[in-house]
Structure formats: structure tokens, C-alpha cells
Swiss-Prot record:
Part of the RNA polymerase complex. One of its GO terms (molecular function) is DNA-directed RNA polymerase activity. Its main location: cytoplasm. InterPro entries: RNA_pol_su_RPB10, RNA_pol_suN_Zn-BS, RPABC5/Rpb10. HAMAP family: RNApol_arch_Rpo10. This is DNA-directed RNA polymerase subunit Rpo10. One of its GO terms (biological process) is DNA-templated transcription. Belongs to the archaeal Rpo10/eukaryotic RPB10 RNA polymerase subunit family. It holds the Pfam family RNA_pol_N. It catalyses: RNA(n) + a ribonucleoside 5'-triphosphate = RNA(n+1) + diphosphate.
């Protein structure tokens, strides 16, 4: 999937936070602490960022056949 721009439940803009969140978690920081520091406190918004899986690179490998 493509990075979520807004929370699916409440509509809060999240797209600008995703790259920072991803880099910090991959660097070894605790996801909950990163979200707290980014100001993401609602459960619905936290779920949107934590549960997101990037599949777009895997899907682009397949060709469309006519």
C-alpha cells in the first residue's frame, strides 16, 4: 500500500510523520516512544502508522499483460 496521508478513522494528517517514524524505528527506537515524541496520541492514528506495510515495491515487480 501507499503511505497513508490521513488517519483512516479520524482524518488527522499523518503523511508528513511517516518517514520520520519509519527511520527512527528502523534505527532501533521504541515505536511507542517515537509516536509520543511526534505528537501522535490517538489510538486510531497510532494504529495507522504502526500497522502500515509498504507493499508498493513488491507490487511494481509484476507486469500487466494484455
Amino acid at each position: 500500500m501507499i503511505v497513508p496521508i490521513r488517519c483512516f478513522t479520524c482524518g488527522k494528517p499523518l503523511g508528513h510523520l511517516y518517514i520520520t517514524f519509519k527511520h527512527r524505528v528502523l534505527a532501533g527506537e521504541h515505536p511507542g516512544r517515537v509516536l509520543d515524541e511526534l505528537g501522535v496520541h490517538r489510538y486510531c492514528c497510532r494504529r495507522t502508522l504502526i500497522a502500515h506495510v509498504e507493499w508498493i515495491d513488491d507490487l511494481l515487480v509484476y507486469e500487466k499483460r494484455s
